[in-house]
Amino acid sequence: MAASRRSQHHHHHHQQQLQPAPGASAPPPPPPPPLSPGLAPGPTPASPTAGGLAPFASPRHGLALPEGDGSRDPPDRPRSPDPVDGAVCTVAAPAAVPAASAAVGVAPTPAGGGGGGGNNSASSASSPTSSSSSSPSSPGSSLAESPEAAGVGSTATLGAGAAGLGPGVPAVSGALRELLEACRNGDVSRVKRLVDAANVNAKDMAGRKSSPLHFAAGFGRKDVVEHLLQMGANVHARDDGGLIPLHNACSFGHAEVVSLLLCQGADPNARDNWNYTPLHEAAIKGKIDVCIVLLQHGADPNIRNTDGKSALDLADPSAKAVLTGEYKKDELLEAARSGNEEKLMALLTPLNVNCHASDGRKSTPLHLAAGYNRVRIVQLLLQHGADVHAKDKGGLVPLHNACSYGHYEVTELLLKHGACVNAMDLWQFTPLHEAASKNRVEVCSLLLSHGADPTLVNCHGKSAVDMAPTPELRERLTYEFKGHSLLQAAREADLAKVKKTLALEIINFKQPQSHETALHCAVASLHPKRKQVAELLLRKGANVNEKNKDFMTPLHVAAERAHNDVMEVLHKHGAKMNALDSLGQTALHRAALAGHLQTCRLLLSYGSDPSIISLQGFTAAQMGNEAVQQILSESTPMRTSDVDYRLLEASKAGDLETVKQLCSPQNVNCRDLEGRHSTPLHFAAGYNRVSVVEYLLHHGADVHAKDKGGLVPLHNACSYGHYEVAELLVRHGASVNVADLWKFTPLHEAAAKGKYEICKLLLKHGADPTKKNRDGNTPLDLVKEGDTDIQDLLRGDAALLDAAKKGCLARVQKLCTPENINCRDTQGRNSTPLHLAAGYNNLEVAEYLLEHGADVNAQDKGGLIPLHNAASYGHVDIAALLIKYNTCVNATDKWAFTPLHEAAQKGRTQLCALLLAHGADPTMKNQEGQTPLDLATADDIRALLIDAMPPEALPTCFKPQATVVSASLISPASTPSCLSAASSIDNLTGPLTDLAVGGASNAGDGAAGAERKEGEVAGLDMNISQFLKSLGLEHLRDIFETEQITLDVLADMGHEELKEIGINAYGHRHKLIKGVERLLGGQQGTNPYLTFHCVNQGTILLDLAPEDKEYQSVEEEMQSTIREHRDGGNAGGIFNRYNVIRIQKVVNKKLRERFCHRQKEVSEENHNHHNERMLFHGSPFINAIIHKGFDERHAYIGGMFGAGIYFAENSSKSNQYVYGIGGGTGCPTHKDRSCYICHRQMLFCRVTLGKSFLQFSTMKMAHAPPGHHSVIGRPSVNGLAYAEYVIYRGEQAYPEYLITYQIMKPEAPSQTATAAEQKT
């Protein structure tokens, strides 16, 4: 594929000449340089180079997209930071600078060249002036290494603004020009004098529309940058290329300025017009310090530019290590080990925070810091995303290290950040094993308090208790484990578990850190059975007045949480109503502070003293709100007042005006004490009074308030399907998973009542569809039969997977979201919906999933991608669709099976053809060392695979052999040339003459053309041992050697003679007799076991000499038909010339006769006109073609014009198919479609077109249209860019020339410019 280029308009570059220093006269512009030979102006190129194929630097890099690619309009100026903007800077010594634009990144464009458009139209030709533009300092870069290197001298001044800018370009005012120059030069005192709020963000309208901050940042003027920022400079300001000041600072490596801009809010992921981020700029230039600073401030290294390149793809070799996390990795690890905070923070980035050491235990920084008790380092690493679950070579996590060495604080930190307390290494040792075996008593207690299980055994069958070195520790481990188990059961208010774990010795067990007892945990529990658990604990002897570390009794805890049901139990068992905590507060203080009116009333009724003053000097009333103060001042039990009653009724009726009159902070959460203890919000939510609900929520209504049955207002709204109310409540913080006394959640209510939209709302906000009510039913269990939409909704991922499997597109469309499109079948093979759609041949579903972002290369449990499924079951259309979405055709599963292995093993012929046409590698082996050919079950698939495999990869019995003859060894008379002395393509299309090779050996005449002497096999070049091996009968060699039977003796033997010498198997005798007959008759290729090759019936390849006119004509045709294609170099690579290594003429008598016969038929059917053309053909099956000719089985029905054999008049088009359709997966060695190393092969063929059918749009055909012999696809606006030629019978083409070549990497723009100057 020819190199892609984006055409540019250069008129601004012509106008914006460099201005002389003040006081100097402007030199006249130099005349345009003369054109190089072969680069004459005009639309018709004089050579391939002149044809627009020279490397052309885009505004961003050396290989631009073609014009009209739709991504954006071509810019008027090359894209580069302001320090090198030639529109605003001039040089004091004009003689040293060419009169062309000083902007960086503009590559020379040959006259008449330019990038081809989307429809291959020629772009506007650049002026000669643009040919001498300065180029980037390195290929692929639009930025010079330094401002001075870009052609801006240290004494440069800003241009006059008007002079030389041409009409229509605004001039820069003198004051602004002076400010910009001061920013550029770093003259901070001058900047302070000139800058003000009005011009701090002024734009350089004569240049790149840059701000003063762009200039100061690009030139690294830190003091100026600081002052500009203080004056209000906009760090987000963009120039006309979309660059912000941070881009400039990063491109030129000013790390301090970069840090300053980032601290002032500059976006580290800002993208310019070509989607380049500051990290792209720094990486391209190898600015390591800047890369580190950017990554530390959140730069995303995965962002890709318009060309699909990430910062890593474009990075200078020196910066690649930073982007892979390998930069100074050893120093980072040492800093973590030694506790060197400064060094660590200088190197630490999100990309290396979890790096592993290259040797030793493969530890991460967190492993080392944890093991060496570097608490501050551990904190920093965790704050910066260190993985607490990372494993070293032995499977140890950082928690293992900390526990093994008894580092309590580090252990606490790791647990706080989610470390798995029961993580196991390769020997199944947990952190508790490590701590217990080393007698780390306090660490053991800490681990147990976080759920460590001392009963887990390692690979030796030993538990942590078994490994404890002392009886005291063993006893402590057992005791604390039981105690923590009881605490956990109490937290969950699990009555059965509490009964099971409860024992007298642990009834008052205290959590080591918080000193909470099981009773504290029970009264704090949110579960409905807390009251029963508390009663059980108290009956078994729990201390009702036990205090935790804050001196809070269970009553304090219950009062603070308004768990009024438990308070009744505590009161009954003698809880002290006026017990004081560490702040001198009673339970009444706690309830008052939390605003729990009912709790305060209850405590007062139990005898709490409202007059007690805390250590801070407050009574309970003084700590409460107005409603609490009123209650405590009255100190009498309340009943529903008339005002409260009227408020409740107004809320129920939706009387907003009355609600507004009666509602106050004191009664907004009043209760219906004679009923269910509902609040006004309960009533308004249940009766769908939206306006009342909204008013109550804005005036302090409690969304968590529970009635007598444990229902919150959200239960009411969901039960009755009031969507707006439910949405309001959720928005104001209502819990979607709250359960009533019967463990019904709002989702239970909505599901049971068939409220689809409510269910959807709740699930969207995190409702748990697996929660069970008291009867053990989930919301799904309560859905009525027939409510399939709700069932699907509640089944979640399972429903989407089922719909994909069954091919129900409507269900898939309804259920699919960006979050679940790649969900997994966790109960099965871990398949995605796309796996199932592909395996069950649900094309519409697969297409929908792919359009909406499904991962085309997602692997299931066995490592299979969707293409494996489609290939295994023979779903051709699905496979073609997956390939269209760039699936990996050579993906391997866990057993190294590729999709081609699957298709070959299952006998899927069409799929094998499709995969091979798109670059599937037939030589890949699975774990058993088998290629697809080894697994093939059908003969046609074997043939396909043999044709696609390179000769060196084929088994001996399948290897085709061609005789290679140097043309210099054959006299011209014996090999008539199809070419005249003139090297024109017209001379290549003459009649096909008989190319029999005389003199050398009459290879084209066949064995029958020569008399065989008695007892001699003519033309034979093998012994009996080779012959037997070729037939797979090596085991008979001993018999033949004993009987001294040679091939000429064998030729006269029949069944009886063979039987007499001991060959009893009829099959063996038959194979021997037929093999000799074919050997004598030269019938190659009919027996797959026959390995010998008779040169007189096979293919001869004549090596043409480079000085041969025929060689030169073919090469010239090949070089001159390189075109620019719309794929931007994606399929055939980026190049502008071939390196032709070898051209061989293909001579095969059988194929030639077949071609001539078909040509005669076509001519008779088309009024004696066979319409022959010389055309190019690229294919993975070239080796098979030169031996067997073109085969329709290689055709792909999904081609633009159906299952035909495609040819092109442009070599660059055929080059796109050398490795498969669309370039396949690239060369076999490097998997690179643009590989400049590997050799490629292409055919230059004689093609009999006969009567052609002109077609402008896609048409799927298996045969030529009636009355026609071929199809010509003509270029059109939205169709082909160049003509394609299609035949549907293989014998209509003959492979005349086999061309071996390489594509050549385009030269750097600077080299091209230098070469052009030298030629001039």
UniProtKB/Swiss-Prot annotation:
Domain of life where this protein originates: Eukaryota
Enzyme Commission code(s) on record: 2.4.2.30, 2.4.2.-
PARP catalytic domain residues: 1105-1310
SUPFAM superfamilies registered for this protein in UniProt: ADP-ribosylation, Ankyrin repeat, SAM/Pointed domain
Region described as Disordered: 1-88, 111-152
Swiss-Prot/TrEMBL ANK repeat ranges: 174-202, 208-237, 241-270, 274-303, 361-390, 394-423, 427-456, 514-546, 550-579, 583-612, 676-705, 709-738, 742-771, 775-803, 829-858, 862-891, 895-924, 928-957
Pro residues biased stretches: 25-46
GO biological process, one term: negative regulation of telomere maintenance via telomere lengthening
Binding residue positions for Zn(2+): C1227, H1230, C1235, C1238
Post-translational modification: Phosphorylated on serine residues by MAPK kinases upon insulin stimulation. Phosphorylated during mitosis. Ubiquitinated by RNF146 when auto-poly-ADP-ribosylated, leading to its degradation.
A GO molecular function held by the record: NAD+-protein-aspartate ADP-ribosyltransferase activity
Keywords for this protein: ADP-ribosylation, ANK repeat, Cell cycle, Cell division, Chromosome, Cytoplasm, Cytoskeleton, Glycosyltransferase, Golgi apparatus, Membrane, Metal-binding, Mitosis, mRNA transport, NAD, Nuclear pore complex, Nucleotidyltransferase, Nucleus, Phosphoprotein, Protein transport, Repeat, Telomere, Transferase, Translocation, Transport, Ubl conjugation, Wnt signaling pathway, Zinc
GO cellular component, one term: cytosol
Biased composition (Basic and acidic residues): 69-82
Domain (SAM) ranges: 1019-1082
Record's subcellular location: Cytoplasm; Golgi apparatus membrane; Cytoplasm, Cytoskeleton, Microtubule organizing center, Centrosome; Nucleus, Nuclear pore complex
Primary localization: cytoplasm
Record field: compositional bias (Basic residues): 1-15
Protein's membrane topology: Peripheral membrane protein
Catalyzed reactions per annotation: NAD(+) + (ADP-D-ribosyl)n-acceptor = nicotinamide + (ADP-D-ribosyl)n+1-acceptor + H(+); L-aspartyl-[protein] + NAD(+) = 4-O-(ADP-D-ribosyl)-L-aspartyl-[protein] + nicotinamide; L-glutamyl-[protein] + NAD(+) = 5-O-(ADP-D-ribosyl)-L-glutamyl-[protein] + nicotinamide
CDD domains xref list: SAM_tankyrase1_2 (cd09524), tankyrase_like (cd01438)
Comp. bias (Low complexity): 120-152
Quaternary structure annotation from Swiss-Prot or TrEMBL: Oligomerizes and associates with TNKS2. Interacts with the cytoplasmic domain of LNPEP/Otase in SLC2A4/GLUT4-vesicles. Binds to the N-terminus of telomeric TERF1 via the ANK repeats. Found in a complex with POT1; TERF1 and TINF2. Interacts with AXIN1. Interacts with AXIN2. Interacts with BLZF1 and CASC3. Interacts with NUMA1.
Role, per record: Poly-ADP-ribosyltransferase involved in various processes such as Wnt signaling pathway, telomere length and vesicle trafficking. Acts as an activator of the Wnt signaling pathway by mediating poly-ADP-ribosylation (PARsylation) of AXIN1 and AXIN2, 2 key components of the beta-catenin destruction complex: poly-ADP-ribosylated target proteins are recognized by RNF146, which mediates their ubiquitination and subsequent degradation. Also mediates PARsylation of BLZF1 and CASC3, followed by recruitment of RNF146 and subsequent ubiquitination.
UniProt family annotation: Belongs to the ARTD/PARP family.
Protein name listed in UniProt: Poly [ADP-ribose] polymerase tankyrase-1
Organism, scientific name: Mus musculus
Organism phylogeny: Eukaryota, Metazoa, Chordata, Craniata, Vertebrata
